[in-house]
């Protein structure tokens, strides 16, 4: 019986020595991936993420990097490389019950707060940004728009302006042109008109001149003829002789008398006759002559006159015409020009305006969002207090420290296999690890973080004291049985 007792106690001690955690509660149903727990001093951020890297000097097995997830994802992500025996049932996700400091929720609260804050901030920011952006955008847009608008506007404006300007310019130009044209036209017209007028005037003048000439000629002829005829005929036959003598005498006397009398009479008669005849003749002659002369004269005169007249007339006409034309042209041109100019101007202006507006808007929005998140956390905390104390291992103070994790993984570097290692602690929360299937042939020195699977393991009952007491009692019993056998 004593030998059986010694054998039983010895077996118990040997098993306990070889498998120190076999009688402990190593159930990992409450295990969690390290990336889901908080382990820093202020309980507000995730535990610093670890990256396992190979170091040439073998002094450090782990390197810490905040840009890589802690330790590793669970092996379900690579089901294609894992056998059915290695697949495990996904652990139930445990909600993080850590209390968060008020106003420091960066998730739901900030999302809702930012949405509300951005709306208010953007409204104020855009108002200021658009004002500055439109000012710069309109300046550039109008410059391009006016160019196209004025081109179309000036075309229509100049057309109307030139019409009004030419009317006034032509009036002044024609006056100067006609003066020069009439001078040349009258010269040619008078030549033709005088020729026709003199013909008619001489005819009328000769009739009047001959009448006056004959009167004087007859008086002189009769005086000489009468003297000779009277002397011979007076005595005997003044009565009969005078009749025959006068006829012959008058004929000869009139011929000589008329020749001398007509010369003087015609000169005086023509002068008066021509004056009256020229007036009537010139009127008819000038009409025909001026028509032909003015056509050539006006052509040359108008060219010079219009040039000067149009310059002054167009200036006044274009001013009024351009005003109306530019208004319509600029409206269309500015619309297209402003669209492009405002786009660039508003982009720069809104950027600056939104930055300032969002800062103020987000501050107010985040305050409301964080208050809502705080209330939500308080409700979660209230529910947590009603749960069993077994979930206290979620507290960061109960989780393994960074130094503990580093030291444990370093200690099992050479012995880690594809099976789960023992929990790193015998009381509280620790970690355990194993190799992934695709890293089973790697040397220990070549292992990196991506080659390992890790998870949190927790023991509901601490057994440190029990181990000491039970081992001590076992040794005492063995010694007693041996000594008093």
UniProtKB/Swiss-Prot annotation:
Region (65 X 4 AA tandem repeats of G-N-[AD]-[EA]) spans which residues?
109-368
Annotated organism of origin: Plasmodium brasilianum
**Required for the binding to heparan sulfate proteoglycans (HSPGs) on the surface of host hepatocytes as annotated region, ranges:** 84-92
Q: Where in the sequence is the signal peptide annotated?
A: 1-20
What name is this protein filed under? Circumsporozoite protein
**sequence repeat start and end residues:** 109-112, 113-116, 117-120, 121-124, 125-128, 129-132, 133-136, 137-140, 141-144, 145-148, 149-152, 153-156, 157-160, 161-164, 165-168, 169-172, 173-176, 177-180, 181-184, 185-188, 189-192, 193-196, 197-200, 201-204, 205-208, 209-212, 213-216, 217-220, 221-224, 225-228, 229-232, 233-236, 237-240, 241-244, 245-248, 249-252, 253-256, 257-260, 261-264, 265-268, 269-272, 273-276, 277-280, 281-284, 285-288, 289-292, 293-296, 297-300, 301-304, 305-308, 309-312, 313-316, 317-320, 321-324, 325-328, 329-332, 333-336, 337-340, 341-344, 345-348, 349-352, 353-356, 357-360, 361-364, 365-368
| PROSITE patterns documented for this protein | TSP1 (PS50092)
- Family to which the UniProt record says this protein belongs: Belongs to the plasmodium circumsporozoite protein family.
């Amino acid at each position: 019986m004593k030998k059986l007792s010694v054998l039983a106690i010895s077996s118990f001690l040997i098993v306990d020595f070889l498998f120190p955690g076999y009688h402990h509660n190593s159930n990992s149903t409450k295990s969690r991936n390290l990336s889901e727990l908080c382990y820093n001093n202020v309980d507000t951020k995730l535990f610093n993420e670890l990256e396992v890297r190979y170091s040439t000097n073998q002094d450090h097995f782990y390197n810490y990097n905040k840009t890589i997830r802690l330790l590793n994802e669970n092996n379900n992500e690579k089901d294609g490389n894992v056998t059915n025996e290695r697949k495990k049932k996904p652990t139930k996700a445990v909600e993080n019950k850590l209390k968060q400091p008020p106003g420091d929720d960066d998730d739901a609260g900030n999302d809702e707060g930012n949405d509300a804050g951005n709306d208010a901030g953007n409204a104020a920011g855009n108002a200021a940004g658009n004002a500055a952006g439109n000012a710069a955008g309109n300046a550039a847009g109008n410059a391009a728009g006016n160019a196209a608008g004025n081109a179309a506007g000036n075309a229509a404006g100049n057309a109307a302006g030139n019409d009004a300007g030419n009317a006034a310019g032509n009036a002044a130009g024609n006056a100067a042109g006609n003066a020069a044209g009439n001078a040349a036209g009258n010269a040619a017209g008078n030549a033709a008109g005088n020729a026709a007028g003199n013909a008619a005037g001489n005819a009328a003048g000769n009739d009047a001149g001959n009448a006056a000439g004959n009167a004087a000629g007859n008086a002189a002829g009769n005086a000489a003829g009468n003297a000779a005829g009277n002397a011979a005929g007076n005595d005997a036959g003044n009565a009969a002789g005078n009749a025959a003598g006068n006829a012959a005498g008058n004929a000869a006397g009139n011929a000589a008398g008329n020749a001398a009398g007509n010369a003087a009479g015609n000169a005086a008669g023509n002068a008066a006759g021509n004056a009256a005849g020229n007036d009537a003749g010139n009127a008819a002659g000038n009409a025909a002559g001026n028509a032909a002369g003015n056509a050539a004269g006006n052509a040359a005169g108008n060219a010079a006159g219009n040039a000067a007249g149009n310059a002054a007339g167009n200036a006044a006409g274009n001013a009024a015409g351009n005003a109306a034309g530019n208004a319509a042209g600029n409206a269309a041109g500015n619309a297209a020009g402003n669209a492009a100019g405002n786009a660039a101007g508003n982009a720069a202006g809104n950027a600056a305006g939104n930055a300032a507006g969002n800062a103020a808007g987000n501050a107010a929005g985040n305050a409301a969002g964080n208050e809502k998140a705080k209330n939500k956390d308080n409700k979660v905390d209230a529910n947590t207090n009603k749960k069993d104390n077994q979930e206290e291992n979620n507290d960061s103070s109960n989780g393994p420290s960074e130094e503990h994790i580093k030291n444990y993984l370093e200690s099992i570097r050479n012995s880690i296999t594809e099976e789960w290692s023992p929990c790193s602690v015998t009381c509280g929360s620790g970690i355990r690890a194993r190799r992934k299937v695709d890293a089973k042939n790697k040397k220990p020195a070549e292992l990196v973080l991506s080659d390992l699977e890790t998870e949190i393991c927790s023991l509901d009952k601490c057994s440190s004291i029990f181990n000491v007491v039970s081992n001590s009692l076992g040794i005492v019993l063995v010694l007693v049985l041996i000594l008093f056998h």
